């Protein structure tokens, strides 16, 4: 497989895993506030989803390490996916606008990811 394509696929596994994990966390937080009586049913659904997310994360870590040969790049890619996905999901699900500190933190995270990938 093409090295660049393999790296992209490996990072995509990380992004999907982080996205599913964050989504399940936010769904249970949002819906628990709406209906505390159905917490157990919601917990079971989100437990299954976060288990799938864990599978994607494991696959993402093993393929990313194989592709990049550097665990630090894998860690940065994982953190970067969280920095991008979590604010998007938070805004989509909760309709809350980020604070200036959140925006600055996201910008610095993006800069850090770019620096780690280049050097």
Residue ranges and their predicted role:
Residues 1-119:
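Polytopic alpha-helical membrane proteins, predominantly small-molecule transporters/carriers
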